[in-house]
Amino acid sequence: MPRRRWRWTRMTLTRAHYKIDGQLCLHWRPNSGNSRDNLQIWWQLKNWLQNQLIQQGLSLMTI
């Protein structure tokens, strides 16, 4: 009986936002392999996250 192999699918973050109750909600989709789009999305997320933290009086030094 052949063993079942699990394949890791790289995921791309497409959207991030806060829900009404304050929880962070992340939207993912399978990676299409377009690394330029991927980079752009991560860059937008970084900027968005930075803005969220600044609004809350925090700063994100590591990103």
Curated annotation (Swiss-Prot):
Location in the cell: Host cytoplasm, Host perinuclear region
- Does the entry feature the keyword Transcription, yes or no? no
What is the predominant subcellular site recorded for this chain? host cell
Q: Which residues form a coiled coil?
A: none
What biological-process GO terms show up in the record? symbiont-mediated suppression of host innate immune response
Entry keyword set: Host cytoplasm, Host-virus interaction, Inhibition of host innate immune response by virus, Inhibition of host RLR pathway by virus, Viral immunoevasion
Work out whether the entry's keyword set contains Cell membrane.
Answer: no
Annotated Gene Ontology cellular component terms = host cell perinuclear region of cytoplasm
Role of this protein: Antagonizes host MAVS-induced type-I IFN signaling pathway.
What's in the misc comment field?
Expressed from the S segment by a leaky scanning mechanism.
Q: Which family does it belong to?
A: Belongs to the hantavirus NS-S protein family.
Per UniProt, subunit arrangement is:
Interacts with host MAVS; this interaction may reduce MAVS ubiquitination.
| Name by which UniProt lists this protein | Non-structural protein NS-S
**Which species is listed as the source?**
Andes orthohantavirus (ANDV)
